[in-house]
């Protein structure tokens, strides 16, 4: 982006979150990319940042006026950091790494004009937006991905999960065995409605499992596409439903599991820590998900609210969940 005072900045979008950052002078001593780990803390520009995402990314295309040459095959290893309302990225595509600092922003606050038109509700791109239509490489069933935001698609017919960021459509996980339990969504993929007064569409369905003392507890998660590229979640366990939103501002940056802490004027107390494993994937998702993916989850409660931290080898995310009547 170029501003009226000729400053330039970068607006990024991932999973419905928009972040505006500006290039800053980086300290001379920065860790190497392969020495950085999710969850650790780094002190930069007087702030104690937490590493929340690590991606060994690759640029696949570029358009418009850019300060450097881009194109397919351009390697861009990046590390994302958060501290309260602040956001930073270390870009290891150059040596020394580039440092970009800024904050998440609401899309409407950008007051953008001349944007691509969306259909009513904003959940589905119009006919001018290129959609991918292909066949499941496992069973041959027809599949589709509505936009470039979609990184993986789960086949409802056989249970395989396909990488849609690769036009070769490689499998992220194979088809489920016939004897494996399959869940039917309570809310069908493609269902449309209003959630808290805003239009949404169900585009993805996922089943996860926790094992506790040898007993399996399965829960279901529905990915909802909303207006202007936003996403929300509905989760269900044993008939109990929650609306969940991924947070831009993380409640705390501690690697430890706290007994309690304050967030949004509420005191949240530790409820449980467990491993969640993906059992089933159906529909479209904005990241590469696969069956048998495992994450550590830590839940804190202040009924009817719950804060949930999910941690994998490459990412930490927080979600605020609110109990709703079925």
Label every model-predicted segment:
Residues 1-326:
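A composition-biased, non-transmembrane "mature-region" signal
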């Amino acid at each position: 982006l170029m501003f009226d005072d000729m400053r330039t900045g970068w607006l990024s979008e991932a999973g419905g979150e928009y972040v505006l950052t500006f290039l800053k002078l980086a300290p001379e001593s920065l860790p190497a990319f392969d020495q950085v780990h999710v969850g650790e803390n780094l002190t930069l520009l007087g702030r104690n940042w937490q590493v929340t995402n690590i991606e060994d990314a690759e640029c696949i295309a570029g358009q418009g006026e850019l300060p450097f040459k881009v194109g397919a095959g351009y390697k861009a290893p990046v590390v994302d950091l958060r501290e309260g309302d602040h956001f930073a990225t270390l870009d290891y595509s150059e040596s020394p790494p580039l440092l970009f600092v800024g904050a998440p922003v609401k899309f409407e606050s950008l007051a953008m004009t001349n944007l691509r038109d969306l259909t009513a509700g904003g959940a589905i791109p119009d006919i001018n937006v290129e959609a991918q239509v292909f066949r499941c490489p496992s069973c041959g069933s027809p599949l589709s991905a509505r936009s470039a935001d979609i990184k993986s698609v789960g086949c409802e017919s056989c249970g395989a999960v396909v990488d849609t960021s690769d036009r070769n459509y490689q499998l992220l996980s194979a088809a489920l065995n016939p004897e494996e339990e399959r869940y039917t969504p309570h809310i069908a993929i493609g269902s449309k409605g209003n959630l808290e007064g805003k239009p949404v569409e169900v585009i993805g369905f996922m089943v996860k499992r926790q094992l506790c003392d040898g007993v399996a507890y399965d829960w279901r998660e529905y990915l909802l596409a909303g207006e202007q590229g936003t996403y929300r979640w509905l989760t269900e366990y044993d008939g109990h439903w929650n609306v969940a939103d991924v947070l831009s501002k993380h409640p705390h940056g501690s690697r430890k599991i706290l007994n309690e802490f304050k967030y949004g004027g509420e005191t949240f107390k530790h409820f449980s820590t467990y491993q969640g494993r993906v059992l089933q994937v159906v529909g479209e998702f904005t990241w590469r998900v696969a069956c048998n993916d495992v994450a550590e989850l830590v839940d804190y409660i202040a009924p009817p609210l719950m804060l949930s931290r999910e941690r994998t080898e490459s990412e930490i995310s927080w979600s605020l969940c609110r109990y709703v009547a079925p």
